[in-house]
């Protein structure tokens, strides 16, 4: 008898009953395959943006350095003192107080003028380009005014217009070659080809010839070539400023034909017989004789003043001068334009009250004209032009007064001192709209004094007469005691009274002494 074979049933997952009335249904759970994973959507790559990192300036807690280390006297005058006035032959005041225990000053010979480093760089590049070994010289421009007749003025005005047209057409040609791309990058290969005045001259030959033929008497071809060269050089400088980050957006604008100041550039070969371009202008009256001109000259016309001025570059020969070993510190401010401190004397130059009184009438007229322009917007074009010309006239009067003071003061300082340490005043942040602490009247005073222009003129005069000018940061110069180094918040007080050493002095003179000490530090670098 055969044995029964046991059949083993496979295991089935648990059953679930769903009751629907009387009937029952069995539902079996079956394992489902997991759904196929979809590939992730490709997102557009984000452009990597450079994070702007703020520069952390590690400023020292104290700027004090002992007087012994710099071999400076402790002397500083008290606030109550009698000044002696210096003759200025101008509208401003210049007062001086001498040290009673004055020490003798040593003298030495120095060869002047000193060529500035930027000028040395440019002259070396010119020597490399022209393959010459010309000596490096100090170049300064001389102003010569010319007095053309009415017929000569008409010819010159057409020449100014043609020069501007040639300049604009050459800039349009360079822009068409797409030197700067839309992304902001610079096409270096295109710049080498395009920003070359010879290649631009060849491309714009027909335009140049048509412009020359359009006038009678015709303008010289070399003057038109100078316009092309000027456009190329301006384009290059704009590119370098954009690369170095000095300007945020690259934008070189064409000249408007009706602009205030118009120029033409004239080669030295056209100057003959006390005139230029003798075939067109056989006789030309001038304030100085037009002789010994060996460099390119620019002729400028100002429509407001109606003056024709030639800017002639001249080489100043070197000579030796006896200089005194005497250094000073200068604190620019709002009470006095400049406060000067040296071991033998202190000076206060031009109190702010005198500046207000001298520019009072000009600013009254400026405010009156501005009110007329604001209250009456529907003025005629002729009336508007007249008012704007009046505004420029009174602004020019103020700038001329400041210019006179700047040059006379800088000339006197440069001749008395061999090293000048001047405080670097950040006028831009003070005059900004964000600064609500200062009133508009104070901001106007600061703008009229124009400290930045004064430092520029002082440095130029320093190179000319062999005086070193150092710009010093004014950080903690007013708060620090120049004798012991204690820091104190002064607020609005005009006098610095130290509690630790008992020094009693004017706050501006104390700051000027600190500026001098910081400038004389051996490790200090000009920033």
UniProtKB/Swiss-Prot annotation:
Residues 21-36 have a biased composition (Basic residues). It comes from the Viruses. Coiled coil: none annotated. Residues 21-50 are annotated as: Disordered. GO terms for molecular function: DNA binding; metal ion binding. Zn(2+) binds at residues 481, 484, 498, 501. Keywords: DNA recombination, DNA-binding, Metal-binding, Transposition, Zinc. The keyword Oxidoreductase does not apply. GO terms for biological process: DNA recombination; transposition. In the central section; belongs to the transposase 2 family. This is TnpB-like protein R854. It comes from Acanthamoeba polyphaga mimivirus (APMV).
């Amino acid at each position: 008898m055969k044995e029964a074979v046991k059949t083993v049933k496979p295991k089935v997952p648990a059953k679930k009953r769903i009751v629907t009335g009387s009937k029952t249904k069995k539902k079996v759970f079956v394992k489902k395959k997991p759904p196929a994973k979809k590939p992730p959507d490709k997102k557009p790559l984000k452009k990597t943006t450079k994070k702007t990192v703020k520069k952390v300036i590690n400023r020292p807690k104290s700027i004090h350095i002992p007087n012994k280390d710099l071999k400076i006297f402790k002397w500083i005058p008290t606030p109550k003192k009698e000044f002696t006035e210096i003759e200025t032959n101008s509208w401003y005041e210049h007062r001086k107080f001498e040290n009673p225990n004055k020490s003798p000053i040593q003298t030495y010979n120095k060869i002047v003028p000193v060529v500035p480093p930027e000028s040395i760089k440019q002259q070396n590049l010119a020597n490399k380009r022209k393959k010459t070994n010309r000596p490096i010289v100090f170049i300064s421009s001389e102003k010569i005014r010319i007095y053309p007749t009415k017929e000569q003025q008409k010819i010159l005005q057409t020449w100014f217009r043609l020069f501007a047209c040639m300049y604009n057409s050459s800039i349009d040609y360079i822009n068409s070659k797409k030197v700067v791309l839309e992304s902001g990058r610079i096409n270096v290969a295109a710049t080498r080809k395009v920003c070359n005045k010879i290649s631009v001259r060849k491309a714009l030959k027909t335009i140049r010839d048509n412009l020359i033929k359009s006038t009678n008497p015709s303008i010289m071809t070399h003057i038109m070539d100078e316009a092309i060269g000027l456009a190329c050089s301006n384009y290059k400088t704009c590119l370098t400023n954009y690369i170095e980050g000095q300007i945020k957006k690259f934008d070189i604008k064409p000249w408007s034909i009706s602009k205030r100041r118009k120029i033409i550039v004239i080669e030295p070969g056209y100057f003959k017989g006390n005139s230029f371009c003798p075939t067109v202008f056989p006789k030309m009256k001038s304030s100085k004789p037009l002789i010994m001109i060996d460099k390119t000259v620019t002729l400028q016309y100002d429509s407001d003043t109606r003056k024709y001025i030639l800017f002639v570059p001249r080489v100043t020969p070197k000579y030796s001068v006896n200089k005194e070993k005497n250094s000073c510190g200068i604190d620019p401010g709002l009470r006095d334009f400049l406060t000067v401190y040296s071991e033998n004397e202190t000076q206060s130059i031009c109190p702010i009250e005198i500046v207000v009184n001298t520019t009072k009438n000009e600013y009254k007229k400026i405010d009156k004209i501005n009110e007329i322009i604001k209250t009456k917007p529907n003025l005629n074009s002729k009336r508007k032009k007249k008012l704007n010309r009046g505004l420029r006239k009174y602004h020019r009067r103020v700038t001329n007064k400041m210019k006179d003071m700047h040059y006379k003061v800088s000339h006197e300082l440069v001749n008395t001192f061999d090293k000048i340490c001047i405080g670097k005043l950040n006028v831009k942040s003070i005059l900004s709209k964000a600064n609500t602490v200062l009133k508009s009247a104070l901001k106007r005073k600061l703008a009229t004094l124009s400290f930045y222009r004064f430092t520029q003129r002082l440095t130029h005069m320093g190179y000319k007469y062999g005086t070193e000018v150092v710009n010093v940061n004014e950080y903690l110069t007013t708060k620090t005691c120049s004798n012991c180094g204690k820091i104190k918040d002064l607020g609005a007080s005009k006098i610095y009274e130290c509690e630790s050493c008992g020094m009693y002095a004017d706050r501006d003179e104390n700051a000027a002494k600190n500026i001098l000490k910081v400038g004389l530090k051996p490790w200090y670098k000009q920033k």
